[in-house]
Amino acid sequence: MDMTNAQRLILSNQYYLMSQMDPTNAEKYKRQQLIVERGYELQIRELDKDFGCITETECREIIDFMEMYHAMQESYNMLSEECQAKVDARRLQFLGFDIATEAQQVNYVRFLTSSEGLYPQFDKADHHFNSQMPMLDKYRRMLTTWRNCPRQYHLCSTELAQIFNA
């Protein structure tokens, strides 16, 4: 992150104000203030790690994943009890993404569910959409299979199994 001295001064003052306003996190803000004031470039890079960018295409893809899970859940609810017994209902839960390798995606899902109020039926449980394993490639394979289904919101147990196993 390249900053002029004026920008560093402004940011330093912001961290100072935050340390005064939020005593529980004061040490964190004082540390960040010191990093900015002294220009420690290695540590400055950690300050901008949360400033990510997800393209419109990536956002739409994540929404498509979530919509696919919504469709699978609704399809499951419309199945007879006999057909429901053939489906592992645990696999209908949208797990989210891996916070270690897919942090931007996790944060976007959290934004959609918390701030935007979308998909309230998704159980965030204790993990809050941190799957703790990379999921992007898996979701892409599942999405391809789901899109090939003729009735995407009226899936049978066989189609659900095909999507899960993609």
Curated annotation (Swiss-Prot):
Coiled coil: none
Source organism, top-level taxon: Bacteria
InterPro entries reported in the protein's UniProt record: UPF0304_YfbU, YfbU_alpha-helical_sf, YfbU_helix-hairpin_sf
NCBIfam families: PRK05445.1 (NF003936)
Recorded family membership: Belongs to the UPF0304 family.
HAMAP family registered for this protein in UniProt: UPF0304
Name by which UniProt lists this protein: UPF0304 protein VF_1794
Record organism: Aliivibrio fischeri (strain ATCC 700601 / ES114)
Species lineage: Bacteria, Pseudomonadati, Pseudomonadota, Gammaproteobacteria, Vibrionales
